[in-house]
Amino acid sequence: MDPDKPDIQISDVVISVQGRDQGEVFYVIGREGEYLLLANGKNRTLEAPKRKKQKHVEKVLRSETRVAAKLLSGDKVLNGELRRDLAFLSRGMQANDLGG
């Protein structure tokens, strides 16, 4: 694990910094060794998550939404819930970037 990167856990929101999905926002839904399992509910669903090395993502925030709580507790999460949550969080991040 990279000592310069914060510890990324299940239910964290991350942004891809490498690869063709660079700039996309994902939820961390699991781990497989050195890989994170990422889903956004659109092109990367819960049924077919993206496997990506931790060094290729950057932690955006530790989410405290209902979706994050479901991921942590192991409850069923729908792809639509992921999409809505990430759209809401992305709008908030864009507003912060614009000084709003």
Map each language-model feature to its residues:
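Ferredoxin-like alpha/beta domains used as RNA- or RNAP-binding modules
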Residues: 1-10, 17, 27-100
